[in-house]
């Protein structure tokens, strides 16, 4: 960790949080990752409630990082690379608004960076369809149940990626 550096948070939804957490956990400069829920109206949601699509929440990963060791722009690159941002309310076989592509920004600087990154990604020619990723202010982060935390790491790797 950088000397006298404050840690920052970034929050991303890109489908099943098991895979997304595993992608960010491996990035040098990321201090911690947590699987959880954000963006809905139900307080203290459970996994079953979120999967029922009645809470408005997305499965997300809260990333705590040292900005002296890894930039927010680099985390955005990981986000774009770990899912298909052109799929509306789904990733592969996982279907529903809880699997939506979303960037929850924690500051005006993060919002600007996320919007610029989306524009760049759209112009890159990497995607045949328009990007549907939402960019919205961060809301209350609700931790997912313990068995979801570091799910793939606890099982020796693997992937839930389609």
Curated annotation (Swiss-Prot):
GO molecular function per UniProt: L-methionine-(S)-S-oxide reductase activity; peptide-methionine (S)-S-oxide reductase activity
EC number, UniProt record: 1.8.4.11
Catalytic activity, as annotated: L-methionyl-[protein] + [thioredoxin]-disulfide + H2O = L-methionyl-(S)-S-oxide-[protein] + [thioredoxin]-dithiol; [thioredoxin]-disulfide + L-methionine + H2O = L-methionine (S)-S-oxide + [thioredoxin]-dithiol
Enzyme class: oxidoreductase
Gene Ontology annotations of biological process type: cellular response to oxidative stress; protein modification process
Keywords: Oxidoreductase
A GO CC term assigned to this protein in UniProt: cytoplasm
Domain of life, per lineage: Bacteria
Residues of the active site: 16
InterPro entries referenced in this protein's UniProt entry, alphabetically: Met_Sox_Rdtase_MsrA_dom, Met_Sox_Rdtase_MsrA_sf
Function: Has an important function as a repair enzyme for proteins that have been inactivated by oxidation. Catalyzes the reversible oxidation-reduction of methionine sulfoxide in proteins to methionine.
Homology family: Belongs to the MsrA Met sulfoxide reductase family.
Name recorded for this polypeptide: Peptide methionine sulfoxide reductase MsrA
Organism annotation: Geobacter sulfurreducens (strain ATCC 51573 / DSM 12127 / PCA)
Protein encoded by which gene: msrA
């Amino acid at each position: 960790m950088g000397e006298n550096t404050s840690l920052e948070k970034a929050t991303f939804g890109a489908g099943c949080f098991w895979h997304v957490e595993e992608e960010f956990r491996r990035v040098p400069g990321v201090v911690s990752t947590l699987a959880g829920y954000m963006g809905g109206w139900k307080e203290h949601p459970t996994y079953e409630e979120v999967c029922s699509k009645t809470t408005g929440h997305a499965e997300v990963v809260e990333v705590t990082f040292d900005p002296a060791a890894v930039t927010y722009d680099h985390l955005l690159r990981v986000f774009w690379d770990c899912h298909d941002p052109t799929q509306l309310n789904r990733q592969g076989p996982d279907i529903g608004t809880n699997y939506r592509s979303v960037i929850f920004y924690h500051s005006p600087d993060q919002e600007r960076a996320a919007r610029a990154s989306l524009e760049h990604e759209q112009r890159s020619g990497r995607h045949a369809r328009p990007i549907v990723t939402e960019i919205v202010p961060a809301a209350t982060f609700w931790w997912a149940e313990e068995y979801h935390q570091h799910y793939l790491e606890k099982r020796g790797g693997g992937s839930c990626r389609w």
